[in-house]
From Swiss-Prot:
It catalyses: di-trans,octa-cis-undecaprenyl diphosphate + H2O = di-trans,octa-cis-undecaprenyl phosphate + phosphate + H(+). Signal peptide: none annotated. GO terms for molecular function: undecaprenyl-diphosphatase activity. The chain crosses the membrane at residues 5-25, 43-63, 84-104, 106-126, 184-204, 213-233, 248-268. This is Undecaprenyl-diphosphatase. Keywords: Antibiotic resistance, Cell inner membrane, Cell membrane, Cell shape, Cell wall biogenesis/degradation, Hydrolase, Membrane, Peptidoglycan synthesis, Transmembrane, Transmembrane helix. It is found in: Cell inner membrane. GO terms for cellular component: plasma membrane. It is a multi-pass membrane protein. InterPro entries: UppP (IPR003824). Catalyzes the dephosphorylation of undecaprenyl diphosphate (UPP). Confers resistance to bacitracin. It comes from Sinorhizobium fredii (strain NBRC 101917 / NGR234).
């Protein structure tokens, strides 16, 4: 393994794990790191499997809660309604994502300027929503009605534009629909599970002919980095947003997006 490949794998894996579950857009950070810092993905297999690292991180952290929900399904109406709400929230992105996958990957992912602009605009919107004197009507994800979940799922579709952030879109939508900050972030976690698994499966299928494990060491480094970083973020995010809200993430988006535009203007 070349030193540059090891460093790239480590950096990209950390970026994926650290940014996947917070409202700053992991896609934007990975693409901008590649554009400006030269941290190119070692290949299609690597790009697909670091996503799996982040997915396994959230499944591990939420394993006990998921098991409790599964065991309660036969007897609990509340558990069944919650699972239905998550699935109905997942449906819009599943349908649109499957239909528009090629266009999104081929066109939108190749426009760094668009990504930077979306980062800034999304940051401004998130900052504004975080500052609104909203009165939450829902403080527990298990009390979210399916109609609310569907609306949050429609917001998630905005994340197909690189730079938007899947968690950012769902959290912003949830807050506007009357949830509190902590439960908005937690519902985003639950919605991430089928959404990320679906996106991973689709990417795996689309890249099936290009998959190769020749650089298994590099792939393992990126996978482990994404997995460990993802665990750290998932375990700490709910308490963080309960006390500090989403303003720090909004500011970060604006700073990164602005720096990206300046970089594109200076060096292209």
């Amino acid at each position: 393994m070349a030193d540059q490949s090891i460093i790239s794998a480590l950096v990209l894996g950390l970026i994926e794990g650290l940014t996947e579950f917070i409202p700053v857009s992991s896609t934007a950070h990975v693409l901008l790191a590649g554009h400006f810092l030269g941290f190119k993905s070692p290949g299609n297999t690597f790009a697909v499997l670091i996503q799996l690292g982040a997915i396994l991180a959230i499944l591990l952290v939420y394993f006990q809660k998921l098991l409790s929900i599964a065991l309660a399904l036969p007897t609990s109406v509340k558990a069944r309604r919650f699972v239905f709400s998550v699935l109905i929230a997942f449906l819009p992105a599943a349908l649109i994502g499957a239909a528009a996958h090629g266009f999104i990957k081929a066109v939108l992912f190749e426009t760094p300027m668009l990504i930077c602009v979306v980062l800034i605009v999304g940051g401004v919107i998130l900052y504004a929503i975080d500052r609104l004197p909203l009165q939450p009507r829902y403080t527990d994800v298990f009390d979210y009605p399916p109609s609310l979940a569907l609306k949050i799922g429609l917001f998630q579709c905005l994340a197909m534009i690189p730079g938007t952030s899947r968690s950012g879109a769902t959290i912003a939508g949830a807050l506007l629909m009357g949830t509190d900050k902590r439960s908005a972030a937690e519902f985003s976690f639950f919605l991430a599970m089928p959404t990320m698994l679906g996106a991973f499966t689709l990417d795996l299928y689309k890249n099936r002919d290009a998959l190769s494990f020749d650089d298994i060491g590099v792939i393992a480094i990126g996978f482990i980095a994404a997995f460990v970083a993802g665990i750290v973020v998932v375990r700490s995010l709910l308490d963080f947003v309960s006390h500090r809200g989403f303003t720090p993430f909004a500011i970060w988006r604006i700073v990164v997006g602005t720096a990206g535009l300046v970089g594109l203007w200076l060096v292209g």
